[in-house]
Amino acid sequence: MGGDLTVKMLGGQEILVPLRDSMTVSELKQFIAQKINVPAFQQRLAHLDSREVLQEGVPLVLQGLRAGSTVLLVVQNCISILVRNDKGRSSPYEVQLKQTVAELKQQVCQKERVQADQFWLSFEGRPMDDEHPLEEYGLMKGCTVFMNLRLRGG
């Protein structure tokens, strides 16, 4: 395809992204993350003309984007929390209260190098369900979520 896609931020700054036919929203977000140091999970992208939010996993060209198109980037605000692992070590995580427990678990998986099915999270003594948003648990800036390993055996 060739050509560039323009990503425009609310502050007016713009970045140019080399566009490929097969490029997906996830790949675009990774490119943006490298350029402006905003994690992919904090990014919301919309087609500037239609104002439609771009769909994950769908090639950009199938969403009406081509060389010369402009995408609007909105950065979602985050809070910083701690996750304490089974060894008692706490690590900081940047999260949005709208994201699900499963999304936080994916962040933990990457940092702790453990599979999602090998642990569960709890906050203030309550187990956290994967499908529920973090806001349901009353998380606040600086709070600690606990990582609990699943027991093996029978």
Curated annotation (Swiss-Prot):
SUPFAM superfamilies on file: Ubiquitin-like
Any one Gene Ontology BP term: positive regulation of interferon-beta production
Post-translational modification: S-nitrosylation decreases its dimerization, thereby increasing the availability as well as the solubility of monomeric ISG15 for its conjugation to cellular proteins.
Oxidoreductase found in the keyword field: no
Record PTM S-nitrosocysteine, positions in chain: C78, C143
Domain Ubiquitin-like stretches: 2-78, 79-154
Tissue: Expressed in endometrium and uterine flushings of pregnant cow. Also secreted. Not detected in spleen, liver, corpus luteum or muscle.
PROSITE patterns: UBIQUITIN_2
Location in the cell: Cytoplasm; Secreted
Cross-link (Glycyl lysine isopeptide (Gly-Lys) (interchain with K-? in acceptor proteins)): G154
Ranges where the record places region Involved in the ligation of specific target proteins: 150-154
UniProt motif LRLRGG: location: 149-154
GO molecular function, one term: ubiquitin protein ligase binding
Main location as per UniProt: cytoplasm
Annotated site location: Interacts with activating enzyme: R150
Keyword S-adenosyl-L-methionine applies: no
Induction: By type I interferons.
Comment block on domains: Both the Ubiquitin-like 1 and Ubiquitin-like 2 domains are required for its efficient conjugation to cellular proteins. The two domains play different roles in the ISGylation pathway: Ubiquitin-like 2 domain is necessary for the first two steps allowing the linking of ISG15 to the E1 and E2 enzymes while Ubiquitin-like 1 domain is essential for the final, E3-mediated transfer of ISG15, from the E2 to the Lys of the target protein.
Task of the protein: Ubiquitin-like protein which plays a key role in the innate immune response to viral infection either via its conjugation to a target protein (ISGylation) or via its action as a free or unconjugated protein. ISGylation involves a cascade of enzymatic reactions involving E1, E2, and E3 enzymes which catalyze the conjugation of ISG15 to a lysine residue in the target protein. Exhibits antiviral activity towards both DNA and RNA viruses.
Self-association state and partner proteins as the record states: Homodimer; disulfide-linked. Interacts with, and is conjugated to its targets by the UBE1L (E1 enzyme) and UBE2E2 (E2 enzyme). Interacts with NEDD4. Interacts with PARP12; this interaction inhibits PINK1/Parkin-dependent mitophagy.
Protein's name in the database: Ubiquitin-like protein ISG15
Gene label: ISG15
